[in-house]
Structure formats: C-alpha cells, structure tokens
C-alpha cells in the first residue's frame, strides 16, 4: 500500500503542476506599435517633401543655369586633365591593342597592390597574390593586334562598370557581402561605351564611358555596326529626348515584346522618343495612351545592336528633354532616392554618395566628373576650401549657400538642403556613421536626410569635418572667386592654428574666438609647437593636474623645460591668460624671441588673440630651426 500511495502522491503532484503550467497567465508583451518609416534625429516626415526645402528659397522656379551654360561647364570638365571626363563623340576610332594589353596589365598590377592584404572574396577567402594573378590574367585580350578599330557599344541593361573582369566580389569584411569594391560606376540603359578589349575568357568587355574606364559583362552591351549608328542611338536632339529623373522604374511586361519587358530604368537615363504616328497605331500591341512611346536598345543573338519600341508611363518621373535647372527641380530629384540602399561604386543597382550626385545633375544635362577628387580639379567649378574654417565661419557660409551645393569631407559627399530651426540639413547616400542612439558605428546603408551635427564613425561631427564645397552649375572665369560672406579679421590666425593643430575648438565644435584664453591653452599650444615631446611622467608635476587629464603632458613638459613653474605648486590652467604672461612663456620657449612677438599687456587675451600669437611663435620657432646659410 505504501508504494501505491507513494506513486499516487507523485501522480497528483504532476497533475497539479501541469494544471499550473496550463492555466497560469502568460505575461503580456509590452504593447508595441507597428513599424513605421524611421528618420534620423531632427528629421520629420514633412522634410521628405521636396517643396519643404525649395519653399525656403525666394524664387524656387528661377533658372540657375541655362543649357548653354551647362554645356560650357561640361566642356571645361572634359578639358581638365585628370578629371576622367571625356567627350565620347571625339574618341579616336583606332588604337594599338597590344599596347592596351600592356597598359591593362600594369593598371591591374597597381590595383592588386592596393587591395592585397585586406580583401576577401564572397566565399570568405582572403585573396593572396596567387589569387590575384589568376584574376588579372583575364585582362589580356588574346586577339589583340597593333592596329584595331574601336567597337561602339550601347548598354542594353542597367549594369556595373567593375575593376576586374571577374565574377567575384572584393570585400573588406567577409561577413558583409553588400559592400563590394568591384563596382566603379553604374552604366545606364542606352548609355554609350567604347569597347577596346575582350577579356581572355570572353565574358567581359574592357570599355570607356564618359566618366570612367573598366570592365562590363558582354551580355549587357550591344555592338553597333558603325559609329554613325552608335551616335544615332544616344546623341539625341532635344526634341527626341525622354529623361528619367526618379530613382528607378521598370517597363511593363508584354508577351509580344519580351526584349522590352521588365527593363530597369534608373536616374539620369535618356531614351529616344518615337516620332508621332497615326493615333490608331499600336505600340507593342496596344495604344500608347498615357504613355510615351520610346525605343529601347536590345542585343541581338549575334551581339549586334538594334532598338525596339517600348512604353513609358507618363506618370513616371520623366521629362521631355533635360529638366530645367531650378531649385524646385533640384529638390525634387535630390529626394527621389530617399530610402534606397547604398551601393559602393553604384553597385546593388543603387548609388554611392558621389554617384548619386552625378546622377542627379545628369538629369539636367550637367555631366560632372565621377567623384569629388576629380571634381576639384575643374578650375571653373567654384571650390570653397573650408577645412581650416572655424565652426562659426562654416555656419556663416552655409547660411549663404544655395540648395544643391555639394559639401565634402574625406570619404563622403552630400547635397545641401537648407537650414531649419537652427540646424543644417543634407541629403546623401550613407554607408555608416555613429548611431545617435547607441553611440556605436552603425551601417545605415541608405539614402537619407540628416543634420550636420550627426557624428561620423570616428566620433567627429559632419560639420566639423567639412573641408570642401562645390557648386556644380556655376562657372567661374579665370581668377574669379565665388562670392561668400566676408570672413572675420581673425580668420587668418584661427585657420592657421586649426590647420596646424595648435589649438582646438571647444567640444561643442565652436572656436569661440572672443572667449578669454587660459594658461592651459597657452602651455598646450607651446607644447604642440615643440612637437609634443614626451615628458618624464614619473617626475613631480602640479598638484592640481590629475593623471590622464587633458593637459597633463603639456603641463609636465612646461615644468621640466623651465617654461612654466605655476604658482604654489599648482598649474592653475583655467586662470585667464594675460599678454604679459604669454610673453614670459614665449621668452623661455624661444632661444631668441623677437621683440613684440606677442602683446605685452596685463589685459586678458581672447582666443583669437592667442591664435594670432601662436602663428607668430610657430613662425619664429620654424625660423630658428633653419640652418645658417652663407649668401653667395
């Protein structure tokens, strides 16, 4: 009986436990709203409306540049050595194929030197020299001769111009297959290319576009019978152009026109409009009601070019000829790609930062150099170099900039939208930045609007890193400068100390030139001029300078070098700096300080005055370094 009773008790406990599990209430999840589109801090939904930004301009429909003026800007870019812009109409029709093979080998070898040691393929294999040897062997055209004729090609698909004639990816992170260094630039449907070589495996053409040179898949290019047919495909008169200015669209599917079905059309694509015909005439088996009838290029089975009718819905983002370059139209095109994925080199059928701006301006007939490095070579394009501007000076300049100006810092380009509620806004396609929520590096990989106080992955704000501004539609005469706000009298000195790294802005980013300078700032400045020598960290320092504090090394150096001994064993770094004290420090710092090098006064020096003195001290110190020379 005891054993039966024992199992009965165990069974009862199990049943009770099961009841508890079944009947116990499940903790309710916190109510969460369904996901909605996210925006960066400070960005609202109304800011995604182009009219929000163009409405900040007095006359958003005023013409910023005429087609003739933009043609002159295009010509200036083409004439600029190193811009990689070329007039496709003027390309020579013959070339030395053997010499080109040699040039391709040398160029590929240079690319390998750049990538070797930090690149993986899509299978997670780190690429070694022997891997690159196999890849680069494919650049050789086995049929090259000393005298060859250019083959004139037309892109039949939106495709990528890539670095190597190779099906693989070039990844800096084997876990991140969406960031591929292979693409150089996107090639749009109906874009012309000049074909100079075929890869050893026959899968790729070596081509030149209007802005870049690289490799493209053979199946994406149709070869015209001659240059005349090639020119007729893309060098269109204004009355025949249809320009797509949205992010992307796809042609309708039709069983009777499979070659024209489902074709991706991307920003900046220019297609040929068909001539008007009988109103009852069918286009791909239907009337072209509410549609533009156009021609799309196709590649025949033998690789040759032909064109087929297609329909483009008139409700798409299309324009008869290039859009007039106005503020309203610029805002409309600039925001058309919001939310699209980032694609390095215009990969993933999308854009990177500079290719987006290139595509935007192509919608107006302005064909800029492909990237910021090449753009800055064009002398006639206004280039305002602001790397050494204080934050106050940058803000004054931004206040005067028009929408559509291109702002740059190393590694990124963005388009300026305007100022709202004291914040400066830009649109760009971004790979990564410091998350404003977690403070960690985050892959945004998106075309987005954000403020300039957002931080890069290095922790610095975008506005603090700005170093160049371009205004693409303005052409300057030789020696002419783009008008900008008058710089303050102290700009020479503040820009000097910022460029040399002798003084820093405050953590807010502002230089605050009128604020009183301090002893710590003066000692820090002298230490930096001296080259930041390492002091004896074990030696006795100042009682009020904590280990690891901002000015610890500078303070120790100044004490050990006999430049500044402090007061009563204290550094007193936050004490205001007078001209006389700076003069004393200067006399001890320089072997032979010139008279009047710094202000000799009991008045407190402002940060602008300290910057002026820093420039003078730096110059005197450099002069003392120069070896004595004998005049001949």
Language-model segments: residues:
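Sec-dependent signal peptide cleavage junction
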Residues: 21-32
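Boundary regions of SH3-family modules and the immediately adjacent low-complexity/disordered segments
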Residues: 31-162, 166-173, 178, 194, ...
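Aromatic- and glycine-rich peptidoglycan recognition patches
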Residues: 32-50, 211-214, 219-251, 258, ...
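SH3/SH3-like (including bacterial SH3b) beta-barrel domains
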Residues: 172-188, 255-267
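...with weaker cross-activation on analogous glycine-rich loops/strands in unrelated enzymes
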Residues: 186, 369-437
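Glycine-rich catalytic cores of cysteine/serine-nucleophile enzymes that process amide/ester linkages
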Residues: 248-310, 339-351, 408-453
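Active-site nucleophilic cysteine motif
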Residues: 344-375, 519, 523
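Feature responds to low-complexity, polar/acidic, surface-exposed segments characteristic
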Residues: 480-492, 499-500, 504-523, 527-554, ...
